[in-house]
Amino acid sequence: MHEISFSRRVPPDDTHERPVCNHCEYVAYENPKIVVGAVCSFEGRVLLARRDIEPRRGFWTIPAGFMELGETTQQGAAREVREEVCCEVEIGSLLACYSIPRIGQVLMIYRGQMPSAQHAPGDETSETKLVAFDEIDWDELAFPSVRWALRDWRDLSGEDDFAPRSVPDGVVHQPLPKTGPLPNTGPLSASDAEVV
């Protein structure tokens, strides 16, 4: 039995540095994670959830989380809504696709139509509320992507066709280092809220 250890190097026939097993040359590809979620609405109001987990515990968000194996992006978005805000929604068209290379995530955010105003906190949520767009406390939102999704939802209100948005112009993407450890992907501070 050999000890498993990896080192970062460029594998043969590749162009990027990757973790490679020092014994068998197995390449451990580091790929972005897919996050799925929905801007859920009922009668012109949007559903927000107060996070009860880190990062950004106590801040407001839309229902979203990591996609699971064996589900479509739409199924994942519906599951996240059920888990976080105890609500069944009709998942509509794709609202936005945000690529955030600094934290290795691709966010697929859908429109979610609520059949009623019923909602409740799930296991990762301490509070839920339906709010009008002009009542959103923008300083209390957990992540820049939540702000983008809510604004894109407002801007595309009434348009049901496939019209996905992307990361807003002017957002600075910080590249990952080519060598060494990956940066801390913890919560964003107020000073780097629009730097992703």
Sequence positions of predicted segments:
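Acidic, metal-coordinating catalytic segment for phosphate/diphosphate chemistry
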Residues: M1-A38
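Short connector loops at helix/strand junctions that flank enzyme active sites
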Residues: H16, N31-V35, S41-E43, P55-R57, ...
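Conserved hydrophobic/aromatic beta-strand scaffold that supports enzyme active sites
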Residues: R18-V20, V39, L48, I109-R111, ...
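Surface loops and adjacent helix of pleckstrin homology
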Residues: K33, R51, L141
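Conserved Nudix-box catalytic region and its N-terminal flanking loop in Nudix hydrolases
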Residues: S41-E83
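Unchanged
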Residues: M67-D152, L156, D160-F162, P175-L176, ...
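Extracellular, disulfide-bonded carbohydrate-recognition/adhesion ectodomains
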Residues: S166-P168, V172-H173
